[in-house]
Design a protein with these regions (language model features):
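Surface-exposed, interaction-prone regions used to assemble/regulate multi-protein complexes
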Residues: 1-185
Length: 185
């Protein structure tokens, strides 16, 4: 491991410490094994038909493998049958992020939710290995300050933090009150 990879992982971990204490209130599957976790206060984003509600923090695991485990066992992994995943991921609801660890050089990540760990690990080693000419965004985190942290190992700098293209995330202060009932997507 190079010093650059270790330094990059340390910088990324530093960028993620602000989410410690944020509570997960919505967890769901997207296409395939894409995992979405909304945390912290609720933010309304305007839509064509209706507004949608997202977390002030939104974690999206896309082109990476993942699993949930506690200290004793693996609870579920990304290639389980969808109904099993949909049931098991609900264990994160109501749990707070207590720690985030980033492991170089591949920028594997461990998000600890009150003792239940979400482990994220890359399935590609080079930019474009899944589809020519495109970055392989392993996972991303929308943050309250209006930017997106994207992790793309193999793409030079393994991660970036850039302004969100969603205007409401850039200009609107998040509602930090605790949600009484998670909204449905």
């Amino acid at each position: 491991m190079t010093g650059d990879a270790a330094a990059s992982a340390a910088r990324l971990a530093g960028e993620l410490t602000g989410m410690e204490g944020a509570q997960a209130w919505q967890v769901f599957l997207g296409h395939g094994s894409n995992l979405f976790i909304d945390l912290g206060g609720q933010v309304q984003l305007p839509g064509r038909d209706k507004a949608r509600v997202v977390g002030e923090w939104t974690l999206w695991v896309s082109l990476a493998a993942w699993r949930l485990q506690d200290a004793a066992r693996v609870l579920v992994a990304c290639e389980e049958p969808r109904p099993v995943i949909a049931e098991k991921i609900t264990v994160l609801k109501g749990r707070r992020v207590t720690a985030v660890t980033v492991v170089p050089p591949a920028m594997e990540a461990v998000f600890d939710f009150d003792g239940v760990r979400l482990l994220i690990f890359p399935i590609h080693s080079e930019t474009g290995s899944a589809s020519a000419g495109k970055e392989n965004r392993q996972w991303a985190l929308w943050r309250p300050q209006g930017d997106i942290v994207s992790v793309c190992p193999g793409s030079g700098e393994a991660w970036t933090a850039k302004p969100s293209t969603e205007p409401a995330r850039r200009t609107r202060a998040p509602d930090t009150s605790e949600p009484s009932r998670p909204p449905q997507r």
